[in-house]
């Protein structure tokens, strides 16, 4: 059990190592080629999402819902919701380039990351070393419990399916295929799936990571930023549904918060440097 926790903790800190590697690569190559620029944007996005989302509200929603429903259903709903939110945020961020030059957007993004870094540093220093996510987890559990009450009647209505299942065994192949397609559609768009989708979507709306994606997408490599964020969200959602509640109670929120602040300060320096070296 201890080894599993250690492995989970290492996986949770993997984005931090990725960010360090991306920063080192950027420092070594001041005059970067197109491919290395794409890779830098991609790794920055993955690392930012990884550190921002571990233990976040959307992470806890996926972790707690996975204890009540099928993990595949929870993962598909959470990952789809976050992917759509990320794509919309990226498109909104890149559209700002139409009104401002790349130099100004990079400068504003750098200032934004400085503010985020400062706020996270203050939050981290005010936390105790043993600070956890118990309070936020209790809030999410209460929210889920209220919404689950509306699903109880649906579970009762499924009691008469045995007779239909017997008829299906004797049905033709065509009818069986149609039934499987209908089952898949009802699985993907079931009330539970929609509930998880909306809870994650609304939980991410206006979040620090969403605003960061908007800022990062002002760069010319915005599709790589979007791709990195989508993959980062998918990794975090996967961790959440597999063992998110255990992981969230074992990691140090103070450490994650301070590591995130350091990452935002690094991003701020990179974007401000880009603002002063970019030629319009």
Swiss-Prot record:
Name the chemical reaction catalysed here: Ca(2+)(in) + n H(+)(out) = Ca(2+)(out) + n H(+)(in); Mn(2+)(in) + n H(+)(out) = Mn(2+)(out) + n H(+)(in)
Query: GO CC: one term?
Result: fungal-type vacuole membrane
What does the induction field say? Answer: Expression is GCR1-dependent. Promoter is also bound by the RAP1 transcription factor.
Q: Which InterPro entries has this protein been placed in?
A: GDT1-like, GDT1-like_CS
Residue ranges, Vacuolar compartment?
25-45, 93-104, 205-222, 277-280
Keyword Ribosomal protein part of the UniProt annotation = no
Question: Which PROSITE patterns does the entry link to?
Answer: UPF0016 (PS01214)
What effect is documented for mutating residue 71 to C/H? Loss of function in calcium homeostasis
> Which chain positions lie within coiled-coil regions?
none
GO BP: any one term: intracellular manganese ion homeostasis
Which residues span the membrane? Answer: 4-24, 46-66, 72-92, 105-125, 184-204, 223-243, 256-276
What does the sequence similarity comment in the record state about its family?
Answer: Belongs to the GDT1 family.
PANTHER family referenced in this protein's UniProt entry, alphabetically: TRANSMEMBRANE PROTEIN 165 (PTHR12608:SF1), TRANSMEMBRANE PROTEIN HTP-1 RELATED (PTHR12608)
Miscellaneous notes: Present with 2170 molecules/cell in log phase SD medium.
So what does this one do?
Divalent cation:proton antiporter that exchanges calcium or manganese ions for protons across the Golgi membrane. Mediates the reversible transport of calcium or manganese to the Golgi lumen driven by the proton gradient and possibly the membrane potential generated by V-ATPase. Provides calcium or manganese cofactors to resident Golgi enzymes and contributes to the maintenance of an acidic luminal Golgi pH required for proper functioning of the secretory pathway. The transport stoichiometry remains to be elucidated.
Q: Can you say what this protein is called?
A: Divalent cation/proton antiporter GDT1
From what organism does this protein derive? Saccharomyces cerevisiae (strain ATCC 204508 / S288c)
List the taxonomic lineage: Eukaryota, Fungi, Dikarya, Ascomycota, Saccharomycotina
**Gene this chain is encoded by:** GDT1
């Amino acid at each position: 059990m201890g080894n599993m926790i250690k492995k989970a903790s290492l996986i949770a800190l993997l984005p931090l190592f990725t960010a360090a590697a991306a920063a080192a690569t950027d420092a070594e190559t001041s005059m970067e080629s197109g491919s290395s620029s794409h890779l830098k944007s991609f790794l920055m996005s993955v690392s930012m999402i990884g550190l921002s989302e571990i233990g976040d509200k959307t992470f806890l929603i996926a972790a707690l819902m996975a204890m009540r429903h099928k993990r595949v259903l929870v993962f598909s709903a959470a990952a789809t919701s976050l992917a759509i939110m990320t794509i919309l945020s990226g498109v909104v961020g890149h559209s700002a380039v139409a009104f401002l030059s790349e130099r100004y957007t990079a400068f504003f993004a750098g200032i934004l990351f400085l503010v985020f870094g400062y706020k996270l540093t203050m939050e981290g220093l005010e936390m105790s070393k043993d600070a956890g996510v118990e309070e936020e987890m209790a809030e999410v559990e209460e929210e889920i419990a209220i919404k689950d009450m509306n699903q109880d009647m649906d579970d009762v209505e499924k009691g008469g399916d045995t007779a239909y299942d017997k008829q299906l065994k004797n049905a033709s192949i065509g009818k069986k295929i149609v039934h499987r397609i209908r089952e898949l559609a009802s699985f993907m768009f079931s009330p539970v799936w929609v509930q998880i989708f909306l809870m994650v979507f609304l939980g991410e709306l206006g979040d620090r990571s969403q605003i960061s994606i908007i800022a990062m997408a002002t760069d010319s490599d915005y599709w790589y930023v979007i791709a990195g964020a989508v993959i980062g969200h998918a990794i975090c959602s996967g961790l959440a549904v597999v063992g998110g509640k255990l992981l969230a109670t074992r990691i140090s929120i103070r450490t994650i918060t301070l590591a995130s602040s350091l990452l935002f300060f690094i991003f701020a320096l990179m974007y401000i440097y880009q603002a002063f070296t970019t030629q319009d």
